[in-house]
UniProtKB/Swiss-Prot annotation:
It comes from the Bacteria. One of its GO terms (biological process) is ectoine biosynthetic process. This is L-2,4-diaminobutyric acid acetyltransferase. GO terms for molecular function: diaminobutyrate acetyltransferase activity. Pathway: Amine and polyamine biosynthesis; ectoine biosynthesis; L-ectoine from L-aspartate 4-semialdehyde: step 2/3. Keywords: Acyltransferase, Transferase. Belongs to the acetyltransferase family. EctA subfamily. It comes from Halalkalibacterium halodurans (strain ATCC BAA-125 / DSM 18197 / FERM 7344 / JCM 9153 / C-125).
Amino acid sequence: MQVQCNEKAFKGGFIINSQIATAPPKTLDTTITIGKPTVEDGAAMWELVNKSTLDTNSPYKYIMMCEYFAETCVVAKENERLVGFVTAFIPPEHQDVIFVWQIGVDSSQRGKGLASKLLQELISRDICSNVNYVEATVTPSNKASQALFQKLAREYNTQCEVSECFSEDLFPGDDHEAELTFRIGPLHP
């Protein structure tokens, strides 16, 4: 199912799954389509990551996520051009958790609330009906992602717990920071 989001038509709000949310940080000037990815989106996801400071994975990772995890991944397109995505999965050992692997937003859409909208779309899907926690790993220097997950906790009026996940000495080379786990929830009382 594709959802059309046209913020100007809703006086600063946006539609996700037919629900109106209010007060995004900035208004988008165009229509953004939010939905499930197809394998054809994998290459565009990889290209978006390569234009950013995100950890680069192989193109295969993005194509594979689109093929086998489309229910837990989200893409945003402007005039058929990919401008944002979330890759995520439900860990087999923790069916009440959605683990967000990566969020990418094109520079043309940063600061407009698109990452929040993508997360809201993900959480609202039927596959997440038993999910009570959102988890992600974030480096200490990634203040934007930290703020995004703290905002998500505020939106759900719940906790955002931060703990060490992977220390920097686990990563090969000298250029990878530690990864902190951000755990948001419970989402439902």
